[in-house]
């Protein structure tokens, strides 16, 4: 059967092709399944998977098939960017995973059949990929779980594929890093360094969310407002975004929420608003804010508040673009200047599973995500359905939009490949 694979040059991410293949299918290995990607979400996060593909081994998730046509079978030069979503089981020799069942996880942006080697995990219905070439991946990327299709509409699955993987970052930040119920977890995860109850305490802090209308930014704001003890803080939340109108319907919160455009971020009115709250601490969570305006804000707020004010800078994401070498060097200098703390969602998720137990963790995360959707937290986003790998309605076009910076953040892009 002819399938399509979307391949990307590891050396030049703007160079990409859709390749038609008719691959021979070997005998299924022991404790294995064969699947085809069914429904996946595409966001600017997919660019991060490519930019950091070597460092975090995301390129190893789904290597290009060696029997694909040359030159696209050269794994040193070409790769497949993974995406979150659902896949249909074509064959299985694992009793707990029957053929035709649906799995959620991290899939290739292609329609060719792929094999997974799985062992049972916790809770029931979850499995762990144990192929040797994937062992450098973070645990969350090797986790797959069966889906009860009778309990999920296709529309819910689409929102889950596009929003939930990124939303999860804001959920674990609130629940485990700025914890009110558990021992706090360092933003990079267990073993990354000291992160005390004082570090987690937001009761006397103003939180500043940069790129607040991003999916991660929305998640963090909503979780602070709707999934936190009322006495756990913060004093207030400042949201900076290029699209303030998208955040008009703020979640109901026990604290004040102010939303500004980047041009207003370092303005006197904004700085005075923070100063009047007399915070002992300012926590800046950067989900991909504009560097110039962010730097101006940090300088302005630091020079205005008392010297005793504690500043905590959490770096979650960057601007969704390919960064030139000089921009990368400048970014590194800013990290050092402000003592930025990098966040790693995978490390916090691992800690959360350890603290709560896998069953409680995943049940809690999904039920909280459902509440997030029910409260219309992404009501301004338009769900856009695409299909296939190649062409103007397929994944190939989505990648071109990502590279060109024209993938609209106000749209939730999902693609049917089944």
Where are these regions (language model features)?
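Eukaryotic N-terminal targeting leaders
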Residues: 1-27, 416-418
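Glycine-rich beta-strand-centered segment in the early N-terminal region that forms part
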Residues: 24-41, 54-112
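Rossmann-fold NAD(P)-binding glycine/threonine-rich loop
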Residues: 301, 317-338
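Adenosine-nucleotide cofactor-binding segment
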Residues: 226-297
């Amino acid at each position: 059967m002819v399938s399509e694979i979307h391949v990307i040059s590891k050396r030049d991410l703007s160079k990409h092709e859709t390749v038609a293949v008719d691959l021979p299918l070997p005998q299924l290995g022991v404790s294995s399944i064969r699947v085809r990607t069914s429904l996946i979400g595409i966001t600017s996060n997919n660019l991060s998977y490519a930019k950091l593909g070597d460092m975090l081994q995301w390129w190893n998730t789904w290597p290009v098939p060696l029997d694909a046509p040359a030159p696209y079978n050269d794994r040193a030069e070409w790769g497949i960017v993974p995406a979150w979503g659902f896949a249909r089981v074509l064959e299985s020799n694992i009793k707990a995973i029957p053929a035709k069942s649906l799995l959620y996880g991290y899939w290739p942006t292609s329609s060719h059949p792929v094999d997974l080697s799985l062992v049972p995990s916790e809770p029931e219905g979850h499995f762990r990929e144990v192929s040797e070439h994937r062992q450098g991946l973070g645990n969350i990327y090797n986790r797959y779980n069966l889906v009860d299709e009778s309990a999920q509409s296709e529309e819910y699955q689409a929102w889950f594929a596009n929003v939930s993987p990124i939303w999860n970052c804001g959920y674990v930040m609130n629940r485990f890093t700025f914890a009110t119920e558990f021992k706090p977890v360092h933003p990079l995860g267990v073993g990354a360094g000291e992160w005390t109850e004082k570090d987690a305490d937001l009761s006397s802090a103003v939180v500043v969310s940069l790129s607040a209308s991003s999916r991660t930014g929305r998640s963090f704001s909503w979780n602070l407002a709707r999934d936190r003890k009322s006495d756990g803080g913060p004093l207030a939340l400042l949201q900076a975004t290029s699209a303030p109108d998208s955040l008009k319907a703020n979640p109901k919160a026990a604290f004040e929420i102010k939303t500004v455009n980047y041009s207003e971020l370092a303005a006197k009115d904004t700085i005075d608003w923070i100063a009047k709250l007399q915070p002992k601490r300012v926590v800046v969570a950067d989900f991909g804010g504009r560097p110039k305006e962010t730097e101006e804000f940090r300088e302005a707020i630091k020079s205005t508040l008392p010297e005793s004010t504690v500043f905590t800078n959490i770096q979650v994401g960057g601007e969704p673009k390919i960064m030139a070498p000089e921009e990368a060097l400048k970014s590194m200098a800013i990290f050092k200047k402000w003592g930025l703390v990098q966040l790693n969602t995978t490390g916090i998720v691992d800690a959360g599973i350890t603290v709560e137990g896998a069953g409680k963790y995943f049940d809690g995360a999904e039920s909280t995500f459902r509440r997030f959707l029910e409260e219309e937290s992404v009501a301004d986003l338009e769900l856009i359905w695409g299909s296939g790998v190649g062409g103007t309605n397929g994944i190939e076009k989505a990648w071109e939009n990502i590279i060109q910076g024209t993938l609209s953040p106000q749209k939730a892009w999902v693609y049917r490949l089944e």
